[in-house]
């Protein structure tokens, strides 16, 4: 597509022997877009995207002008169409996305169209990283055993992905055992400046030119934001939005407010990037940045590596922002070189960024932001976050005290908090606060050599003093790329990590996403028999309830060195700032300060062992896979041959009976309430990723289809089968439905509800199916921050398939709100100060929403009529959170995929 180029900014840039076409921001400023050089760097990337894609339809001149107007007001509610350069997926979200594409090919044929039109138009990379589970640990055979188990459990899914790789163009699969998608993206896939050949006229010459532009992406995982640390603008979206982008649909969004986060000073000795990101997360959650861009600026950036920046950018979902952006600077150029990017690409990035005013130096003027806040890096202290929120940062000396308070207040364990309990067949006892999982895991930290080498050096020092992990601790090391394993092995540090218990268990997300695997049976039994509040310490990004392990209630985020330290100590009830980790082989107490490595030593190891040659070697055959992958056979065909007996991959029902013209939207009349939830309901609560209980609706379904409980696998691997996922919706073991609140104030946990008007208690799935038989529409009520966490489109898909027409809450997290719209579910918010609780709702009410027929507008005020069981009526004002005109089109079509399919079939 050739831009209309209203601001005459199409120019050429010569880099070495090559000439590139680009859309010059400085030229656009001279030609009418006054002051745009003062924009935040992230907004400049959005502006370039609009200039390059101006077509008079999805991108008009007025949209481009709106960005300069934003500058004057520092905020502007204006809808734009953003076209990312590419799409990134992981397998938990990628499998259902490919299922949707396969189903769309079938639906396209039924509508009389060409199935080949359902094909990615931009590059799509799917990295298989979510399926490996830590079933084995603690020895050098653990890795191979876990790989064998992974292929055994996921053969059918992997065959399907191999079919997709062959059937769709522009679609590549990075096989299992390679790494975590965001780390592979940072270390290999991302280019910072992207190029594409296009036919166009430049000056008087018409032909094919190579166009250079900022690398950008959306991903089907919320931590796609990590790559903003390398100045690549990107964020997580639901799979359905990603599919629409793949098929040529621009991403509809409002111009964001941009919060400037000024960093000054430098971190003190012994402080890590993990401590910094937990501090940033706490500060930004307190400020409130949902739906906003955060951009980091200030002199402190000169003291951060790209790996440090990537750690901060990674946790944008945890602080609530759309992204946390860092501009191109000298550190970015150094990282591109160190990570083995081709020299011509590195030269292009440097030249392009400087030509566009996208290159930050110490002398660069501060951009104009909507608002700002400041952090002196010298104020950051060693920290952890827990026991159940990423923003719950606690300074290291206060962790033990914080757990003690939580034990009494959160977990209601007030009697004998220090009591120890026997473990069958073992000589040790365990108690509250004992660390039963210590995991070096997650791209958040394993992408950062400083904390990995720090952990290795700490392990070396601990082993030298005779320390090792306590026997009740399940230890694991799962790096985000093979590069990490290489430099740990080459440096000799892996051998020391092995000595204290941290053997390699796999390359993938593992414990961070709940794939921690089962605890040893005797430990699990002791925990559950005695009601022990056990702890996990992990170098991940999320510690929500029920996420890490069903046996663990208290979860703490920490740097890799602190993960090792807590494995040695064996408990979060010790103040590691002053109490010993244990007793050395000389009989003397060993303190954390005795074994903590210096930054000088860490940097020396990094300089010697983290080299471009390792990156080049490990990524040379990134798409090839191991022998297990290469053995997988698949049938090449335009449309997928669905196996009706499969419990992993099924043709979803979204397009059944679909016509070329959408059915008119109807009002919601006398809907029943399916569930009433509190604040901070995560997408994990709505659609869990972990283990499937035998007694759950999903477990019963699998049993009925002759699947043994040992082969249930987990919800995340079953996302290609709507029958399992519908039954798993709202089935998290920790979710609480306030409709079931007893007279004593207690609320049972798990996916339960009451069916009305009979008041019978049953599973949420069973109630939803009963309502469907009765042809009764449904709504869900919730509190604040509904749908935070993972970009899990099944949280919206499952909601829709249960028959829910609307979700009414105090506030939504960004991705889940757009996912609901993308599935044709109406998101609504209460006015400030109103909640279902303040209205006195009990759950037996009927809800009517009118005004959906005809002239519905984005962000329109609507009125709900709520009739209680006693016949009393309340009228409640609600805000329609369909935010843009494009979203309104999606809603009227029954969802974004229906909209795109009709458009392609026309």
Swiss-Prot record:
One of its GO terms (biological process) is tricarboxylic acid cycle. Pathway: Carbohydrate metabolism; tricarboxylic acid cycle; isocitrate from oxaloacetate: step 2/2; Organic acid metabolism; propanoate degradation. Its cofactor is [4Fe-4S] cluster. Binds 1 [4Fe-4S] cluster per subunit. Its EC number is 4.2.1.3, 4.2.1.99. It comes from the Bacteria. Induction: Higher under aerobic conditions than under anaerobic conditions. [4Fe-4S] cluster binds at residues 443, 509, 512. GO terms for cellular component: cytosol. Monomer. Belongs to the aconitase/IPM isomerase family. This is Aconitate hydratase A. It comes from Bradyrhizobium diazoefficiens (strain JCM 10833 / BCRC 13528 / IAM 13628 / NBRC 14792 / USDA 110). The gene is acnA.
């Amino acid at each position: 597509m050739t831009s209309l180029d209203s601001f005459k900014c199409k120019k050429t840039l010569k880099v070495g022997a090559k000439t590139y076409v680009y859309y010059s921001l400085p030229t656009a400023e001279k030609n009418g877009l006054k002051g745009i050089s003062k924009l935040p760097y992230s907004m400049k990337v959005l502006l370039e995207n609009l200039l390059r894609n101006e077509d008079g339809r999805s991108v008009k001149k007025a949209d481009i002008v709106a960005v300069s107007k934003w500058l004057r007001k520092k905020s502007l509610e204006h809808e734009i169409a953003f076209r990312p350069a590419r799409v990134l997926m992981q397998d938990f979200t990628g499998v259902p996305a490919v299922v949707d594409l396969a189903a769309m090919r079938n639906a396209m044929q039924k509508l009389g169209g060409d199935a080949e039109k359902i094909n990615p138009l931009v590059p799509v990379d799917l990295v298989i990283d979510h399926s490996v589970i830590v079933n084995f640990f603690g020895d050098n055979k653990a890795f191979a055993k876990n790989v064998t188990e992974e292929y055994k459990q996921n053969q059918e899914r992997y065959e399907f992905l191999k079919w997709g790789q062959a059937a769709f163009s522009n679609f590549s699969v990075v096989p299992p055992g390679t790494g975590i998608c965001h780390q592979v993206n940072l270390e290999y896939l991302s280019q910072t400046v992207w190029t594409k050949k296009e036919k166009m006229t430049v000056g008087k010459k018409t032909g094919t030119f190579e166009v250079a532009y900022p690398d950008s992406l959306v991903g089907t995982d919320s931590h796609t934001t990590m790559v903003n640390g390398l100045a690549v603008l990107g964020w997580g979206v639901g799979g359905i939005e990603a599919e629409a982008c793949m098929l040529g649909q621009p991403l509809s969004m409002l111009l964001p407010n941009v919060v400037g986060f000024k960093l000054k000073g430098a971190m003190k000795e012994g402080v890590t990037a993990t401590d910094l990101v937990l501090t940033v997360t706490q500060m930004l959650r307190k400020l409130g940045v949902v739906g906003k861009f955060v951009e980091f600026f200030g002199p402190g950036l000169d003291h951060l590596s790209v790996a440090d920046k990537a750690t901060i950018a990674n946790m944008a979902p945890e602080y609530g922002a759309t992204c946390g952006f860092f501009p191109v600077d000298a550190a970015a150029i150094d990282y591109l070189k160190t990570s083995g990017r081709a020299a011509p690409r590195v030269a292009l990035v440097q030249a392009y960024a400087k030509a566009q005013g996208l290159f930050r130096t110490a002398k660069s003027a501060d951009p104009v932001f909507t608002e700002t806040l400041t952090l002196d890096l010298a104020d950051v202290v060693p920290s952890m976050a827990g026991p159940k929120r990423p923003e719950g940062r606690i300074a290291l000396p206060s962790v033990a005290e914080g757990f003690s308070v939580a034990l009494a207040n959160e977990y209601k364990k007030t009697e004998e908090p220090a009591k120890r309990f026997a473990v069958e067949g073992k000589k040790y006892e365990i108690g509250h606060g004992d660390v039963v999982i210590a995991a070096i895991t997650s791209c958040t930290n394993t992408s950062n050599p400083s904390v990995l080498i720090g952990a290795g050096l700490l392990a070396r020092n601990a082993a030298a003093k005779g320390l090792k992990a306590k026997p009740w601790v399940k230890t694991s090391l799962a790096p985000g790329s093979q590069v990490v394993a290489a430099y740990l092995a080459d440096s000799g540090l892996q051998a020391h990590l092995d000595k204290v218990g941290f053997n390699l268990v796999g390359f993938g997300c593992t414990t961070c996403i709940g794939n921690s695997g089962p605890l040893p049976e005797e430990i699990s039994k002791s925990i559950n028999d005695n009601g022990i509040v056990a702890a996990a310490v992990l170098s991940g990004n999320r510690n929500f309830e029920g996420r890490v392990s069903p046996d663990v209630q208290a979860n703490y985020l920490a740097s890799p060195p602190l993960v090792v330290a807590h494995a040695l100590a064996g408990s979060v009830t010790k103040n590691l700032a002053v109490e010993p980790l244990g007793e050395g082989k000389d009989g003397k107490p060993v303190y954390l300060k005795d074994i903590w490595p210096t930054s000088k030593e860490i940097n020396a190891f990094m300089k010697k062992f983290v080299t471009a040659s390792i990156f080049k070697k490990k990524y040379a055959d990134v798409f090839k896979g191991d022998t297990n992958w290469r053995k997988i056979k698949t049938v090449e065909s335009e449309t997928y041959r669905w196996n009706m007996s499969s419990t992993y991959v099924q043709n979803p029902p979204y397009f059944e009976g679909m016509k070329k013209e959408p059915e008119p939207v109807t009002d919601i009349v006398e809907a029943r309430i399916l569930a009433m939830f509190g604040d901070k309901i995560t997408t994990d609560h709505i659609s869990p990723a972990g283990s499937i209980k035998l007694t759950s609706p999903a477990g019963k379904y699998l049993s009925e289809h002759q699947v043994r409980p040992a082969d249930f696998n987990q919800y995340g691997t079953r996302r290609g089968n709507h029958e399992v996922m519908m039954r798993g919706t709202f089935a998290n073991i920790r979710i609480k439905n306030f409709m079931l609140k007893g007279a004593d104030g207690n609320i049972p946990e798990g996916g339960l509800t009451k069916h009305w008007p009979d008041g019978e208690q049953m599973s949420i799935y069973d109630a939803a199916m009963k309502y469907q038989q009765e042809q009764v529409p449904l709504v869900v009520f919730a509190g604040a921050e509904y749908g935070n966490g993972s970009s899990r489109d099944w949280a919206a898909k499952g909601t829709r398939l249960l028959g829910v027409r609307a979700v009414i809450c105090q506030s939504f997290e960004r991705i889940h709100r757009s996912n609901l719209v993308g599935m044709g579910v109406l998101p609504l918010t209460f006015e400030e100060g109103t909640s279902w609780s303040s209205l006195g709702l009990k759950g037996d009410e009927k809800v009517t929403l009118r005004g959906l027929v005809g002239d519905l507008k984005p962000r329109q005020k609507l009125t709900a009529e709520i009739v209680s069981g006693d016949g009393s009526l309340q009228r409640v004002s609600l805000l329609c959170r369909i935010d843009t005109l494009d979203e309104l089109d999606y809603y009227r079509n029954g969802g974004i995929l229906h909209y795109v399919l009709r458009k392609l079939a026309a």
